[in-house]
Amino acid sequence: MVLLLVILIPVLVSSAGTSAHYEMLGTCRMVCDPYGGTKAPSTAATPDRGLMQSLPTFIQGPKGEAGRPGKAGPRGPPGEPGPPGPMGPPGEKGEPGRQGLPGPPGAPGLNAAGAISAATYSTVPKIAFYAGLKRQHEGYEVLKFDDVVTNLGNHYDPTTGKFTCSIPGIYFFTYHVLMRGGDGTSMWADLCKNNQVRASAIAQDADQNYDYASNSVVLHLEPGDEVYIKLDGGKAHGGNNNKYSTFSGFIIYAD
């Protein structure tokens, strides 16, 4: 019997827990009536109701590992064109192009003696004139050089004093007008093309009765252009057949 108590007492003590703290180990009540009586409420074994209500229903754990990459989304719309890029380096030299067509024949060259051949002269139109002034002119009027010496092509009209172009090209003109003075005045003579002054000359009467006004021009003319000499004040001397005042011109080459 004693041996049985020795074996049961430790087992009963461990199973009773904290609810049997008021019992004395080894008593007859502990052994004979372990379940008798009313158990006192245990404050240690009963949790606080307010504390249980304040606790969260779950506790957040540590951050997990990164997941696997997802699948690629659909292709987006094209973006706006970007600005032009910098100029690249020069490329390699290309292949030579095809040979062009033959050009027109050139002008005749010089002959063995170094002179211009007769064929060259035949390609230039024969246009030239030279005329002198017979009568006196004064004031503001076109000088009519009526003493005609040369008029190749008949492009100069002595009745109007004007040269009229019929072949476009480069022309040379020169004029010399003698002033009739003696009264202390001056004379101005202008070379005009279609009412526009292209050259001017002046003669002044200082201590002498006569003085010259002269000038020269090279002009490009179109068909219908007119060239003439006009007084812009003063008196021009005409010398019968002496040709003190003259007007001349010729074509250099046609277009």
From Swiss-Prot:
Its main location: secreted. Residues 1-20 form the signal peptide. It is found in: Secreted. One of its GO terms (biological process) is regulation of synapse organization. Keywords: Collagen, Secreted, Signal. May regulate the number of excitatory synapses that are formed on hippocampus neurons. Has no effect on inhibitory synapses. Plays a role in glucose homeostasis. Via AMPK signaling pathway, stimulates glucose uptake in adipocytes, myotubes and hepatocytes and enhances insulin-stimulated glucose uptake. In a hepatoma cell line, reduces the expression of gluconeogenic enzymes G6PC1 and PCK1 and hence decreases de novo glucose production. This is Complement C1q-like protein 3. It comes from Homo sapiens (Human). The lineage of its organism: Eukaryota, Metazoa, Chordata, Craniata, Vertebrata. The gene is C1QL3.
